[in-house]
Swiss-Prot record:
An annotated GO BP: glutamyl-tRNA aminoacylation
Protein name: Glutamyl-Q tRNA(Asp) synthetase
Key word Nucleotide-binding present: yes
Cofactor binding annotation: Binds 1 zinc ion per subunit.
Protein purpose: Catalyzes the tRNA-independent activation of glutamate in presence of ATP and the subsequent transfer of glutamate onto a tRNA(Asp). Glutamate is transferred on the 2-amino-5-(4,5-dihydroxy-2-cyclopenten-1-yl) moiety of the queuosine in the wobble position of the QUC anticodon.
Annotated L-glutamate binding sites: 14-18, 50, 177, 195
CC annotations in GO: cytosol
Family: Belongs to the class-I aminoacyl-tRNA synthetase family. GluQ subfamily.
Chain sites annotated for binding Zn(2+): 106, 108, 120, 124
Motif ('KMSKS' region): 233-237
InterPro entries named among the record's database cross-references: Glu-Q_tRNA(Asp)_Synthase, Glu/Gln-tRNA-synth, Glu/Gln-tRNA-synth_Ib_cat-dom, GluQ/Sye, Rossmann-like_a/b/a_fold
């Protein structure tokens, strides 16, 4: 896998929020990490809206996300990509995988599977169900998939034993995250993925799908999640407060500390653009803690 250079203009990163709510501090840490990692090597930073699940989308969230990123100085390159406009591309790949026998229809209910701890037992693997009204699962091999994360180090997962065949299209017709993210990263030419450590165990599934479709493997950097005292990550479902424009500078500095970066107290009087300019020049991804969570209470 190629290494990063100080001026790697071939670098293409991305931030891919879900418009199910407003951006919060945890979102900021992820966006800032991916932005800095791209800008520090003069790379491109793309923005993709992962809006494949309309029932979960919050009215006004799309525009609010764009406005918040702009007010915090996190400007992106090119046009925003909306996954809701990419359904034809997803459908073509699902059809291809199904017709090749690499995917199959699954009629299992959540209740049937709830005692299997998220590992699909293969009930429908050889059942030959019709596609109508069924989910589509991708067959996985009995293999271990490994990769080296730039922060978390070596990671491996036995797909067959630890995951099982996974859904690429839901029974309601909506496309699964695992499919959409792989297709869109390849289509956009993404070379580097910087995201939260909650997606670390998703990566082997994505590596397998990349391999199956002949895509290049990006570099991965999974940052620690910011968690509340009860251990839950900051998120929309826990009513984490949305980012406010008037707090941009102190929150950017706090996010930098969450990423292990040094901050100068004098920057509290700086503009967001000035904070980002300094952070970009001093970006050290190797300073990010090799852990999967950071308690919010530990951040001053």
């Amino acid at each position: 896998m190629p290494s990063l250079t100080m001026t790697d203009s071939s670098y293409i990163g991305r931030f891919a929020p879900t418009p199910s709510g407003f951006l919060h501090f945890g979102s900021l840490v992820a966006a800032l990490a991916s932005w800095l990692d791209a800008r520090a090597v003069n790379g491109r930073w793309l923005l993709r809206m992962e809006d494949t699940d309309p029932p979960r989308e919050m009215p006004g969230a799309r525009d609010a996300i764009l406005q918040t990123l702009e007010r915090y100085g996190l400007h992106w390159d090119g046009e925003v990509v909306f996954q809701s406009q990419r359904h034809d591309a997803y459908a073509a790949v699902v059809d291809r995988l199904f017709n090749m026998g690499l995917a199959y229809a699954c009629t299992c209910s959540r209740k049937q599977l709830e005692s299997y701890n998220g590992i699909y037992p293969g009930f429908c693997r050889n059942a030959g169900h019709a596609r109508e009204g069924a989910a589509i699962r991708l067959r996985v091999p009995e293999l271990i998939y490994r990769f080296t994360d730039r922060v978390q180090g070596e990671y491996q997962q036995h797909l067959g034993r630890e995951v099982g065949d996974f859904v690429i299209q839901r029974r309601d017709g909506l496309y699964a995250y695992q499919l959409a993210v792989v297709l869109d990263d390849a289509w956009q030419g993404v070379t580097d993925i910087v995201r939260g450590a909650d997606l670390l165990d998703n990566t082997p599934r994505q590596l397998y799908l990349q391999e199956l479709l002949g895509f290049s493997q990006p570099r991965y950097l999974h940052i620690p999640l910011i968690v509340q005292p009860d251990g839950h990550k900051l998120g929309k479902s826990y009513r984490s407060p949305p980012l406010q424009a008037e707090h941009a500078t102190p929150l950017l500095l706090r996010a930098l500390r969450a990423l292990g970066q040094e901050t100068d107290p004098e920057l509290l009087l700086a503009t967001p653009a000035e904070v980002l300019a300094v952070a970009r020049a001093q970006w050290r991804p190797e300073a990010i803690a090799q852990r999967t969570t950071v308690p919010e209470a530990d951040l001053r």
